[in-house]
Amino acid sequence: MFNYKILEDEMENLKNEGLYINIRTLESPQGAWIVVNGKRVLNLCSNNYLGFASDERLKQAAKKAIDEWGVGPGAVRTIAGTMKIHEELEKALAEFKGADATIFLQSGFIANQAAIPTVFGDENDAIISDELNHASIIDGVRLSKAKRYVYKHNDMNELEARLKEARDVQKARRILIITDGVFSMDGDIAPLPEIVELAEKYEAAVMVDDAHGEGVLGRGGRGIVDHFGLHGRVDMEIGTLSKAFGVLGGYIAGKETLIRYLKQKARPFLFSTGLTPADVAACLEAVKILQESDERVKRLWDNANYFKSEMKKLGFDLGVSQTPITPVMLYDAKVASQFSRELFEEGIFAQSIGYPTVPKGKARIRVMISAVHTKEDLDFALDKFEKVGKKFAII
């Protein structure tokens, strides 16, 4: 029989290092204020950027879809599981992103696992990845037989060196550069124009994971490619519907030929049932709302700019963030964990982030601002951060 003491010992080590994850339970819908473990707290750690997770229009769309389509697709999409509503969402996403076509999958994590090994899976291929790319990209690369290269975060000189190595030393058949658009832990933005220039110079493809750019960057939240005006120059965009869109699911956007190929070859698409009609309908409604107005996106940025400005005035270190993602840098994992618990007692739900999510010695409280926060909410948060920050001698 398996010796489970090995697992217990490892978890005990995590506790001793302040890295053990305590999962809190929500007892209310997502919103600016939520009930967690029986306590009403200000929510500063969800990815619900635009407040869509509890939006009435999305809820009504989901309910209507259940009545019209049932609760599940009943099969994988290549057999009998593609409903008209799935295709409607794929078309709407393509229009929203300014792409030829999209393929809709179960999550953004799965979208990366579908895209990378399917298109760049040969041992003669080369994949060059930013060192701070998301875990789903790392796992997607691991599924490929391609030779792997990693470049220092946002370092274009090192990226070019890896491109030269792949082209001139490895003699790679095909080269793929992968980057997050917005890096989820630090909130900084990839230098996508420079990456695209290097890709074109070395005849490489570019893939960007836009999970934290959609609903945040670009016209009406269309993402990082739109933000930089790079339509037609990025080969694959990976998106998620679980953050700014407030629901669930992921997709790949790109040329029509690429999407048709993925529908023939991508294993997560071929061998796993698609999302429920309710999820798809809610996603479709979120896209419609963003196409109608950019009011929520503007409110998100107003809130983020105000909060970050005031936090800096208090003396907090917010790292290199360029987006509403606000890392409050505390560096020590135990301090970050204790800081988070103290905030919770004060009515603030803001989780600590430590290794392995971020490097050792880079622990933080990651604050996620939303369009549904009011100025009063943010002032409440600022007051509590100041109180706890002084208690821990951080400020």
UniProtKB/Swiss-Prot annotation:
Catalyzed chemical reaction(s): 6-carboxyhexanoyl-[ACP] + L-alanine + H(+) = (8S)-8-amino-7-oxononanoate + holo-[ACP] + CO2
Cofactor dependence: pyridoxal 5'-phosphate
Binding site for pyridoxal 5'-phosphate: 108-109, 184, 209-212, 240-243
One Pfam family recorded for the sequence: Aminotran_1_2
GO biological process terms on file: biotin biosynthetic process
Entry-linked PANTHER family: CLASS II AMINOTRANSFERASE/8-AMINO-7-OXONONANOATE SYNTHASE, LD36009P
Job description of the protein: Catalyzes the decarboxylative condensation of pimeloyl-[acyl-carrier protein] and L-alanine to produce 8-amino-7-oxononanoate (AON), [acyl-carrier protein], and carbon dioxide.
Subunit structure of this chain's protein: Homodimer.
Family: Belongs to the class-II pyridoxal-phosphate-dependent aminotransferase family. BioF subfamily.
Protein name: 8-amino-7-oxononanoate synthase
Protein's organism: Fervidobacterium nodosum (strain ATCC 35602 / DSM 5306 / Rt17-B1)
